[in-house]
Amino acid sequence: MAVKIKLQRLGKIRTPHYRVVVADARTRRDGKVIENIGIYEPKQDPSVIKIDSERAQYWLGVGAQPTEPVLALLKVTGDWQKFKGLEGAEGTLKVAEPKPSKLELFNQALAEANEGPTAEAITEKKKKAKEEAAAKAAAEAEAAAKAEEAPAEEAAE
């Protein structure tokens, strides 16, 4: 019995997901399988490729022939190089960065909220700002005048 390692398609029309399966070569694409040895999700970034290396090595060892797409996946994971005894058995599989948990994001947003805004949220109108600046300057001038008068009175006594 000729055995092939091939992809079994799952998912919707434009979002394919595949199972890496071992099946009789004569069965149809989504037909009965002997064993499911992995998954492949090409729409993720980077693509998700999870293949049970031990089972893949076993099936390759007993003569199962991988199809071309599965052969490419086995080369990426390094299982084909390990089977053939070639260098580069660690593979070239890219690993996605772990997403920050929602709890971490919430705690970070809470810490930023407690610190308060670094700049004012609203800007005052120019006319109002000029009036306040003039009033502030007048108050400073009065304070300076009072400060000058107070030492003069003390010196006179």
Curated annotation (Swiss-Prot):
Keywords for this protein: Ribonucleoprotein, Ribosomal protein
Keyword 4Fe-4S attributed: no
InterPro entries (alphabetical): Ribosomal_bS16 (IPR000307), Ribosomal_bS16_dom_sf (IPR023803)
Disulfide bonds: none
GO biological process: translation
A GO MF term: structural constituent of ribosome
One Pfam family of this chain: Ribosomal_S16
One GO cellular component term: cytoplasm
Region Disordered, residue ranges: 114-157
Entries under Gene3D superfamilies matching the protein: 3.30.1320.10
Lineage top rank: taxon: Bacteria
UniProt similarity note: Belongs to the bacterial ribosomal protein bS16 family.
PANTHER family, sorted: 30S RIBOSOMAL PROTEIN S16, SMALL RIBOSOMAL SUBUNIT PROTEIN BS16M
Name by which UniProt lists this protein: Small ribosomal subunit protein bS16
Lineage: Bacteria, Bacillati, Actinomycetota, Actinomycetes, Mycobacteriales
